[in-house]
């Protein structure tokens, strides 16, 4: 979610017919949300199903940017380190799908692979995107370069993601298998 002024995330999280709470019954391996307020990210995550988590039930906050995620694990064990969204400084990232990580890691800067905390394909995809942002030196052009590089890799899986630098929200939908 991106808004010009602080906006409630309640509908997205709780009230909509396909809210993350409802969808978490199928995607029950944890949840996370990054809320941008006062030029700072507040990131909350849990390995508990959102529909059964007390701290999730209490979420009704406002933000100008929000990235929320419910996890159905495919790669990486159930742990906070593997729960989205991931944050590195001002950058926040969440991914949906499963990707082959070998080509991603091969094209990722060593300093980013060294900073991996968890074991998911998603965090490796995040480091791939950050590598391109660093190489290009500008966020929008870097995200664009990362998407082009993903397409050049061919069929590596589903690489749909949300990415933010704290000012803008980028969304990429890619369901190639």
What is each stretch, according to the model?
Residues 1-48:
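Extreme N-terminus nucleophile/cap motif
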Residues 2-4, 36-68, 125, 129:
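Short, compositionally biased leader-like segments
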Residues 27-30, 37, 61-63, 79, ...:
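Short, basic and Ser/Thr-rich N-terminal targeting/leader segments
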Residues 33, 97, 125:
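Residue-level signal for inorganic ion chemistry
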Residues 38-46, 95, 101-113:
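Cytosolic regulatory regions built on CNB/CRP/Popeye-like sensor folds
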Residues 46-57, 68-89, 107-111:
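Short acidic (Asp/Glu) patches
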Residues 83-99, 148-177:
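Conserved catalytic micro-motifs used in adenylation/nucleotidyl-transfer and phosphoryl/amide-
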Residues 100-165:
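Short histidine
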């Amino acid at each position: 979610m991106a808004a010009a002024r602080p906006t409630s995330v309640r509908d997205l999280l709780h009230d909509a017919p396909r809210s993350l709470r409802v969808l978490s019954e199928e995607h029950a391996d944890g949840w996370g949300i990054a809320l941008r307020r006062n030029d700072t990210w507040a990131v909350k995550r849990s390995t508990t199903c959102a529909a059964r988590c007390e701290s999730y039930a209490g979420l009704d906050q406002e933000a100008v940017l929000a990235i929320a995620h419910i996890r159905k694990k495919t790669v990486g064990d159930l742990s906070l380190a593997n729960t989205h969204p991931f944050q590195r400084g001002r950058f926040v990232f969440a991914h949906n799908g499963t990707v082959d990580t070998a080509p991603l890691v091969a094209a990722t800067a060593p300093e980013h692979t060294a900073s991996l905390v968890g074991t998911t394909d998603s965090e490796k995809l995040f480091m791939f995107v950050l590598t391109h942002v660093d190489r290009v030196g500008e966020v929008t052009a870097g995200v664009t370069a990362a998407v082009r590089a993903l397409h050049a890799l061919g069929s590596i899986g589903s690489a749909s993601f949300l990415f933010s630098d704290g000012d803008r929200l980028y969304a990429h939908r890619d369901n190639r298998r």
